[in-house]
Structure formats: C-alpha cells, structure tokens
C-alpha cells in the first residue's frame, strides 16, 4: 500500500484530503507545518507528497527545491 504525505496548514483541507486518500486505500500521514514534514522524512520516505504552496513556516516551492537538491528525495513525486 502506498504511503502519501499531506502537507497542508489548513486543518479542514488537510482532513478532507486525508479522508479521501484513506478511503481510496492509501496510507496517509498529514502535517500542518513544513518542520513536521521534514522530521517525518528522516524516518521514512513516502511514495508521494501532496504539498501546499503557502505554509506558515516555509514556502512550498522552497520545500520542493530543497527536496530536489538531496539525492534521497530528488525523485520524490
């Protein structure tokens, strides 16, 4: 079963996305801040990341740049 990380600061949107994905038989971990997401990446890499562009602690575009600059996460969709 695929693991998807949802990174979204709006709690309502995050919950809707999480429920929809779980109902489609995906494993889902959700985060409201980029810092939480980065800590989770240290433990396990997901198969897919759904990433909000505007987060309270970091811009989503900057997160993508950071992921692309590291060999372990370079090809992470």
Could you say what each language-model-derived stretch is?
Residues 52:
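Active-site residues of response regulator receiver
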Residues 55:
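Receiver (REC) domain active-site loop signature in two-component systems and cognate sites
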Residues 33, 59-62:
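Acidic catalytic/metal-coordinating carboxylates
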Residues 1-5, 11:
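Non-catalytic signal-transmission and effector/linker regions of two-component phosphorelay proteins
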Residues 61-74:
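Short amphipathic alpha-helix used as the core "switch/output" element in two-component signaling
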Residues 10-32, 39:
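Two-component/phosphorelay signaling modules centered on CheY-like receiver
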Residues 36-37, 49:
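Short alpha-helical segment
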Residues 45-47, 72-77:
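His-Asp phosphorelay/catalytic-motif detector in bacterial-type signaling
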């Amino acid at each position: 079963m695929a693991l998807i990380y949802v990174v979204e600061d709006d709690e309502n949107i995050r919950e809707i996305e999480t429920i929809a994905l779980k109902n489609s038989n995906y494993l889902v971990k959700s985060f409201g801040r980029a810092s939480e997401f980065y800590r989770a990446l240290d433990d396990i890499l997901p198969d897919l990341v759904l990433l909000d562009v505007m987060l309270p602690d970091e811009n989503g575009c900057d997160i993508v740049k950071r992921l692309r600059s590291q060999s372990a996460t370079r090809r992470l969709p």
